[in-house]
From Swiss-Prot:
NCBIfam families: S15_bact. This is Small ribosomal subunit protein uS15. GO terms for biological process: translation. Residues 1-21 have a biased composition (Basic and acidic residues). It comes from Erythrobacter litoralis (strain HTCC2594). The gene is rpsO. Signal peptide: none annotated.
Length: 89
């Protein structure tokens, strides 16, 4: 459900805009996407875990708002991120 430190470091390194960037929308969306994928796998075995499902919905909504912000501010960065993470078809 959570992302371990080395995976998070790799995600930050892959999506950061510069070497000290840890909070840009790109990094936040990439981390949320990884957490969402992990929780989705969790629900294949634990379909009655409604407590975690609420957290999943919160993460999806947070990612949606970050993507909307990024699209409003810089469409090119938004399109590059969507392509890189494979979120939209």
């Amino acid at each position: 459900m959570s992302v371990d430190a080395e995976t998070k470091t790799k995600i930050i390194k892959d999506n950061a805009r510069d070497k000290n960037d840890t909070g840009s929308p790109e990094v936040q969306v990439a981390i949320l996407t990884t957490r969402i994928k992990n929780l989705t796998e969790h629900f294949k075995d634990h379909h009655k875990d409604n407590h975690s499902r609420r957290g999943l919905l919160q993460m999806v909504n947070k990612r949606r708002s970050l993507l909307a912000y990024l699209k409003k501010k810089d469409v090119e960065r938004y399109n590059a991120l969507i392509q890189k993470l494979g979120l939209r078809k």
